Amino acid sequence: MRKITFILLVIPIIVFPQRKKDRDTSAVILQPNRIEFEKNRDASEFYVVPGGADGILIVEETLEAGSFGGYEWKLHMVDTALQVVWSSTMILPSDGYIIGYEYFEGRFYLLFNKDRYRSEDLIVYQFDRDRPDFRTYEITTVFPIDITHFESVGETLLIAGYANFRPVVITYNINDRIPRVVPGFYDNKNDILDIVVDEHSQLFTVILQERMKNKKYTVRVKTFTSKGDIIQDNLVNPGEKKSLLDAASTTFAGGLQYLAGTHSRKSLQYSQGFYLSKFINGQQQFNKFYAFAELNNFFGHMKPKREERIMNRIEKKRARGKTKKFNYRLLVHKILERDGEYIMIAEAYYPRYNYSATGSNFSSFGGYAPGTGRGNPYFLGYKYTHAVVLAFDPNCNILWDQTFKIEDIQTYSLEENVVVSGSGDRVILMYLEENEIRSKVVERNEIVEGRTFSPVKLSHENDELKTRDPGVEGIKKWYDETLFAYGEQNIKNPSGVAGKTTRKVFYINKIQYDLDKQPN
């Protein structure tokens, strides 16, 4: 194995903002630490695996040839101060590629395909925080799987996806090293929406969308032990007229489980509101449905005059005893539990298309406008408009709701962009775009600090950002009230850093916040 050679710049606590035109910056966001990894080749790709208070594992895919074939992958373990704990190199076959990664109770897992032409041959590498040694687990699923989920719970790895277009869930115990298919999933009627792991009870919940006999759709939630033994199977009854499009679930705690998602009467692409469900020991207690028009701030991301016009239409409809209907595509996040409340997050988006003959052909209200263009449609990506945050109590009554405008983000696959965190009664919403941490602080239905734009801080006083890769940047939760931003940047410094006036780096900035501070 060839010794790894790279330049690692560990940045001190004092970091400096980039030069940019004046915009409102947040008074509550702090960026105390930063680390940079210099990119020697454009082909390098970085993956970050947050491990709570154990730090972050940074994985770099390179095109550097290994001593006995294959390519080098560089790994760096950093602690919560973004100081390097260890660095290492491993060689992967040239046909192998990374599928997913996971962290659970001090262990970091990387899931790879050994051969891109044989999806049933997998390999998992397990790393610990304190040393670069790793364990290897070779897994053969017998049949090819299109993997969509990779999780870990206790001594068990969870692999889920589709085999022959049907859902399948596999458990793999790292002690006996035997893969087992979890029964009850290989059915054409179901689609896997998500998998939720409870670290404390070491249970996992699989959320499925299921087609009913009346051709409507509902949600089924199955909870298992880490061995794959089922302990609860909940099927939501949405009534005769509604379809449930998606769902997020709380962890299974003492027989109590909540579900939240979106619903519609006809379309499977557009939702008309939210639903909240409560289960106790497998018995559905109730469903509560809320139209978008019933929320206080759902349209708060719009310009004031437009919001006022929409609210007037809602009130006119309400005066006649009816509810105004709105259609949105929403990407639902996981449910957060804090201080006796349950917080649901969703991001509104719409697909954008271009036409070879007539150009753009899309609707800013959330969808493609048919019949207005010519030629073959060319998919440009998903455009995000705003995030919705709502809190509900144990009886599924909505306590408050807020919105957060999203600008400039477009992705080719649906991705969660907005991160929600908080302390006390205050909640902060953040996303990273164009090298800015865009944020908003709310306290229930009140806005504490409006939208702000805090530049990602650079390492040296004379640093100047030249370009950044829009496809490689984001914010992730880390531990407690700490997050981190990451991305790729081209930086210029006339004074020079390590003998260079320009450098291309992959960076991680530690982000903390003080919500007790008064806004600017």
Predicted segments — roles?
Residues 234-246, 289-326, 400-419, 448-480:
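Conserved blade-ending motifs and adjacent loop-strand segments that build the rim/top face
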Residues 19-43, 80-86, 312-325:
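A short helix->beta-strand "capping" segment at the edge of beta-propeller domains
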Residues 40-48, 93-103, 139-153, 188-198, ...:
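Repeated scaffold domains used in trafficking and secretory/extracellular systems
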Residues 81-120, 134-147, 233-241, 404-408:
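Blade-loop segments of beta-propeller domains
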Residues 47-48, 53-68, 104-117, 148-149, ...:
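Short beta-strand elements that form the blades of beta-propeller/WD-repeat-like
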Residues 72-80, 122-130, 171-174, 217-230, ...:
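Beta-propeller blade signature
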Residues 331-358, 369-391, 412-449:
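Loop/turn-rich, solvent-exposed surfaces of beta-rich toroidal or solenoidal domains
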Residues 1-26, 520:
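Bacterial Sec-dependent N-terminal signal peptides
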